[in-house]
Amino acid sequence: MTDTTAFITLENISKQFPGVRALDDVNLTLKKGEVHCLAGQNGCGKSTIIKVISGVYQPEKGAQILLDGKLFHHLTPSLSAHYGIQVIYQDLSLFPNFSVTENIAVNRYLPGGDIWVRRGAMRQQALAAVKRIGVTIDPDKKVEKLSIADRQLVAICRAIAADARLVIMDEPTASLTRQEVNGLLRVVNELKAAGICVVFVSHRLDEVMEVADRISVMRDGKLVGTFPASELDSHELAFLMTGQRFHYSPLPEKPPVEQEPMLEVRHLSRKDKYQDINLSLRSGEIVSIVGLLGAGRTELCLSLFGMTQPESGEIWINGKLVKLRNNHDAIKHGIGYVSEDRLTQGLIMEQSIYDNTIVTVFDKLHTRGGLLDHRKARTLVDNLIRELNIKVSDPLLPVKTLSGGNAQRIAIAKWVATHPRILILDSPTVGVDIANKEGIYQIARSLAEQGMAVLMICDEIPEAYYNSHRVLVMRRGRLVAEFNPHRCREEEIADVVEVINE
């Protein structure tokens, strides 16, 4: 029988930062051989409690940590590692130019490990870890050559090779396809069967419900409670996380009209990226594209924004054939594009919220003398912050000080500032908690109600189903199906994607 006795118990855990009480008297027990999900919005304290467990942060006085039967008042990174606590962060912290073997066995050859590098022993250790979770990875392959999913498995193998007894996974599925997610969840269950405690952090509530034995919900630095997963559903979990009830129903149906499409794509192709794409998008309409990672969705959007060139086909805007040679052409034709990667492509994280918001309209905010009209610019920024409901204490602060949800709203605001007729949103809710997801989709709905045409890439079928007038499915560079949410069930779209997945 699986051992479910406590591996670590945290009592009276508080953590204060200047002006913020990140943890407020949290009590948490993690058991051997269980999958324990930490759920909560961004900023609720999940990352802080993980850093207390891994010894990065020391809690305030009065804390007690019972780790494998021994009492501590705080942990250190080396002490946590000694007891088998391993954290797999979103960036995975792998060495891309090292082989799979070297990454898995690296802990033995860091300071405090063996002096001599024994290649044969390293390989045996790596193969044993790979075998233990039942996967197949080439031990000699450089990590930089691996898919994100395989890198995730390498990080798990490294934890196992370090004799992990508690593995904490922070947003492990954020960049994985559904098939890869299924593979990862199978590995998580293998770890559980081996008596290892797995702490699983994810914004995807369906995955949480699928894999968890117990769920601890955090809100505003406090533990709301710990619940058997069998006693919750995703709607109740969302309520516990946010204190709000979300009512989901498809958007009001848009009746067919003879209105000319705002955007029309005819037989658009780019070698090895997408083939024979035909789609239309009308004023006031939200159309989503779902599909697997690598299906060509982002590549198509990049061409619609002039960043890459199709080899054949046509793009029509407001009934006129256009040639989008670059993004400047796209902007002139009224197209805005919110990138899937806000950290490196969507925002300049070190620059201010103010600068990020006006960067797309900088040339329109000058006085006749050529100087920036700060009054006009500040009015624009203030209006956008208010209209998009962005929580900002001071627009002159760096955008990196914002939460993920508010940073994403700034990425949208900078394009709304251009008054586009067509707005492309590429995976706008990646890494965003449930309340902010709803807020971002409310922005999309509001923009559509104002007459904007919105094209979205969605990674989660429910999000597309409840926030689109039409849902398109893309596979291997081709659009293969179209759904009207008022004439189908959510499961029908999922079934098509699952068929595509096989």
Model-identified regions with their sequence ranges:
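Glycine-rich phosphate-binding loops of nucleotide-dependent enzymes
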Residues: T2-E502
